[in-house]
Amino acid sequence: MTLWVLGLNHQTAPVELRERAAFAGEALPRALGSLRDTPQIAEAVLLSTCNRTELYAVADSAQALDQWLHTQAGDLQGYLYQHADAEAVRHLFRVATGLDSMVLGEPQILGQVKDAWSTARDHGLLGQRLDRLFQQTFSVAKRARTDTQVGANPVSVASAAVRLAQNAFARLDDSTVLLVGAGETIELAARHLSEGKVRRLLIANRTLAHAQELASRHGGVALPLTELDRHLGEADVVFSATAAREPVIHREMVAKALRTRRHKPMLLFDLAVPRDIEADVATLNDAFLYTVDDLERAVEDNRRGRREAAAEAEAIIDLQVSRFVETQQASAHQAPLRQLRAFGEATRTELLERARQQLANGKPADEVLELLAHGLTNRLLHPPTAALRAAALSGDADLTRAAERLFPATPGYRHPPVRPDDADPAP
């Protein structure tokens, strides 16, 4: 079976297609259950973030992955990429290191990759090949970030949004900021906002306890999501990143909030995929909406500063891909060697025990040694002898040549006459 990755990301597909293929909340365990029930896929890890959905799998063909994704998300042809074996390994190493992210070198993608691996393991989708690959991925990503500056001054989508808000409002410390959600992206936004100070921080979430935990860490006020409509007008800046399948902020909600604010400008950042804020909010006067795709342009300056470090990280990845592939190939080649040695050891143990019993029963030692040597020869040579006979009948010249390399002719050796019991030695 082959190692594959099939996916789409912010470079290949717009947000409306990425949200179709996003697996968040209850959709993720359902998708993993479906993968587990797909016989053509032996192992799988599903990575789904705001900017990418990728299926890493051990399968007979990429068609099995493509059919599964088509069933889950519809026709995505023209927006997908796929890699096999060494290139799949390289792709995962680059993703986990942050070299394939919207914000070059962003740190949280490694945590998301670890979560995807852990979730796959919990759902019984992880086998030896993918487990080894992901364990090595974590090691490579750590080394690349430690040995280069690719992770220096990390900039995420959330921090890029905060920076844009800081540029739009000369003083965020005189502004009210509303965070919708309580996941990792909102946590990052809250952390960056706390560093820069804001006058008032509101945090709304479906699970109030999660909002309260976040509020306690960053000096905010927690709200249930049901009160979002009532408090939206208080916010100068809104950051939203929930796992909802449908928008949580609608055009009419923002229009009402703007009337409450007497059309004082409001900045809204939709950091979620699927989107949290209805797209036509952007048509409202005094409402300025940014999506994750808009942030692609906002973070270009950060990429330029990290390209030199990224080149160093790429060199590390190139070396580690080669080493990983060589290790896997060597491991695959070791399997028949281990099998051969196990067969030899089992044969030796069995016949040696038989010889000891014969000695204990008083049989002469010379006769026992002769029987032992004869038995070992017959038992060890029976499988290759039978295989070579079958090869001769089928015309398998490759096996014959392999036998000639494995058992070269011994100069001066004369074959003994074939005894009747040597003709077809028993296994």
Swiss-Prot record:
UniProt: substrate binding residues: 49-52, 101, 106-108, 112
Q: Can you name one GO molecular function term for this protein?
A: NADP binding
Its GO biological process terms?
protoporphyrinogen IX biosynthetic process from glutamate
**Active-site residue list:** 50
- Tell me where the signal peptide lies: none
Give the misc comment.
During catalysis, the active site Cys acts as a nucleophile attacking the alpha-carbonyl group of tRNA-bound glutamate with the formation of a thioester intermediate between enzyme and glutamate, and the concomitant release of tRNA(Glu). The thioester intermediate is finally reduced by direct hydride transfer from NADPH, to form the product GSA.
Question: Under which name does UniProt file this protein?
Answer: Glutamyl-tRNA reductase
Per the UniProt entry, what species is this protein from, by scientific name? Stenotrophomonas maltophilia (strain R551-3)
- UniProt gene name: hemA
